[in-house]
Every structure is written in structure tokens, then in C-alpha cells.
Regions:
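Short, His- and charge-rich active-site/binding loops that engage polyanionic ligands
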Residues: 166-167
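Helical lid/core segments from catalytic subdomains that handle acyl or acyl-like groups
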Residues: 170
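A short secondary-structure junction signal
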Residues: 156-162
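Single conserved hydrophobic/aromatic residue that forms the stacking wall/gate
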Residues: 1-16
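Active-site nucleotide-donor binding segment shared across nucleotidyl transfer reactions
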Residues: 47-80, 84, 89-90, 243, ...
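Small/polar loops that bind or transfer phosphate-bearing groups
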Residues: 4, 84, 260
């Protein structure tokens, strides 16, 4: 049995708020089209900044799947996901402080004291997306793209599962510190104890403990196996072979081309299985219930 379990952040999120019975709460076609246009504009500016500052990134998850299967957004998808290898991700804050275009905001643990997650977001100022999962959390809630770090991952599955669950549990605790109605009933006693312990600790302590564990694995793991430990799909679907990221390939996405891992076929197969087969209608859902602009 695994130590703490292995679900990703997105598993709880989708189960609580985005089952088929809640599809009527999602965005209208016009709202979705407007949201995608703004997200794409963020991606274009992010891509330009990365090129000008020698930052490597790759499209991933639903964005990568959309590029391969649709040459753009998955029709019902409402977000953009990119990843950076850890060495590039660690430069992102410094680069953004000097080069991020006006009107955009790098949301990370340093720039937004209410932000609970282990990954970053590039937010659009003067907008807001209503995300039920983050109700009560005091932070910038503008339209965004996700930027996930890719870390070294233990080759031992039990340790890898621990790494995933450590990050998700500490992140949930940071949400619960702000939203007293938020709770997750872990089935494993060890995870439940960690969750309730972390809720009582100061924010800085929780983040330091989260970063410490991830940092230890980055120091001592071989690097043959990588992972997006804060991704939506959890272990083992967000684990990769390092050679998948050794080279990039440009793939069409909407009106442009964006870098993807050369091993994208293996990545998508691991994440989605038969990824060229569209899901059933009751599995088609997005993240948001409404979008506001020009706040």
C-alpha cells in the first residue's frame, strides 16, 4: 500500500465541482470563446518573453492534446497548461520581474500571499474567473495560464506517491486556512493527520515543508524519471521519462506554433490512454462557472 495515496490536485477538484450533473453551470459558448481568446493572448506574450530570455517551456496536458488532436483548444476546454523543467522554472520569477508585459501578473508563492499552489500562473489583470474550488481564498483571480514545474521523481513508486500526496495535502491545507468551509476527508489516516496538522501551522512553514520535500527529491533522485507533482492527473499519469523532454518539437495550436516535448506521444498515452479517441459527453467539462472582464 502507498504511504499517503496519489491523487492529483485536479482529481478532488473535478469530483467535487465538475461532474456531468454540473455541466449546466459552465460557461456559455460566447463566454468560453472570449476566455480562450484572452488565454491565447497570454500564451502569445508568455511565449515571446520566454524566447527573448532563453526560458524553455512546453505545452502539456489538455493544451498538448488539443494541439495534436484539434490543432488548437479542445472544444470544451477552458484553460492552457505549460510546463518548465525545474532549472527554467526557478528563473521564471526573476525574468517576469523585468520582462513580463504590462497587464499580466506572475502569481506565485512570493507575489501573492494568498496563493496556495506549488505551480505558478500568469494572470490577466482586471479580469476574474469564478472557480468554486477556490471560493473564499483571497488572491488574484484573473484569467490565466498555468505554468507547472517538472521535477525529478523517485523511481521507487512508493516514494513517488508520497511526493505527490505531500504536495497536494499541503496545498489543500493552505486553501483550508483561508476557507473554513473547505475540507477533504482523506481515507488514509496518515494523510488526514498531516492535513489537519498543516492547517494549524503558519503559511510560511507549510510552504517551506512542501518545498523541502520536493527539493530533497530533486537533489537525490537520478533524473531518469520526472514528474509534474502538482498536476491535475496525479500519480502515475503525471510521471515522465527524462528523454521525452530532451528535445522539443513545434506543434500548431490555433494561429501559432508552440513547443511540445518530442516524446509527446508517450506523454499523452501515459496521461490519457487512447488520446485520439474523444471522451464521452458526460466527461466533457471545464473549470469555471463564470468570467468577468474589466473589473
Amino acid at each position: 500500500r502507498d504511504v499517503l495515496g496519489s491523487r492529483g490536485l485536479g482529481d478532488v477538484y473535478k469530483r467535487q465541482y465538475h461532474g456531468g450533473e454540473n455541466l449546466e453551470e459552465q460557461l456559455s459558448e460566447k463566454e468560453l470563446a472570449d476566455l480562450k481568446a484572452k488565454e491565447l493572448d497570454i500564451l502569445v506574450k508568455f511565449d515571446r518573453m520566454c524566447k527573448e530570455n532563453n526560458l524553455r517551456y512546453f505545452i502539456t496536458a489538455g493544451t498538448l492534446l488539443g494541439a495534436v488532436r484539434h490543432k488548437g483548444f479542445i472544444p470544451w476546454d477552458d484553460d492552457i497548461d505549460v510546463v518548465m523543467l525545474r532549472k527554467d522554472f526557478n528563473r521564471l520569477n526573476r525574468v517576469c520581474s523585468k520582462a513580463l508585459p504590462e497587464g499580466l501578473f506572475l502569481q506565485d508563492k512570493k507575489n501573492d500571499k494568498g496563493y496556495p499552489f506549488h505551480f505558478d500562473k500568469i494572470r490577466l489583470d482586471n479580469t476574474e474567473v469564478v472557480d468554486p474550488f477556490l471560493e473564499g481564498v483571497n488572491m488574484h483571480k484573473g484569467i490565466y495560464i498555468d505554468v507547472f514545474p517538472v521535477d525529478k521523481c523517485p523511481e521507487n513508486n512508493k516514494l513517488a506517491q508520497f511526493m505527490f500526496k505531500w504536495v497536494s495535502t499541503t496545498s489543500y491545507a493552505l486553501i483550508a486556512k483561508q476557507n473554513k468551509d473547505f475540507d477533504f476527508d482523506y481515507t488514509k489516516k496518515s494523510a488526514r493527520m498531516l492535513y489537519h496538522f498543516m492547517i494549524k501551522m503558519p503559511r510560511g512553514f507549510v510552504i517551506a515543508m512542501r518545498d523541502f520535500v520536493v527539493g530533497i527529491f530533486n537533489v537525490f533522485c537520478s533524473g531518469k524519471k520526472l514528474c509534474t507533482v502538482s498536476g491535475a492527473h496525479g500519480f502515475p499519469r503525471e510521471t515522465y521519462k527524462s528523454e521525452w523532454f530532451e528535445e522539443k518539437i513545434m506543434l500548431p495550436f490555433e494561429s501559432g506554433e508552440y513547443p511540445a516535448p518530442k516524446g509527446y506521444d508517450s506523454l499523452l498515452t501515459n496521461m490519457y490512454g487512447d488520446y485520439m479517441k474523444p471522451p464521452e459527453d458526460d466527461e466533457k467539462s471545464g473549470h469555471f462557472t463564470s468570467v468577468e472582464s474589466d473589473k
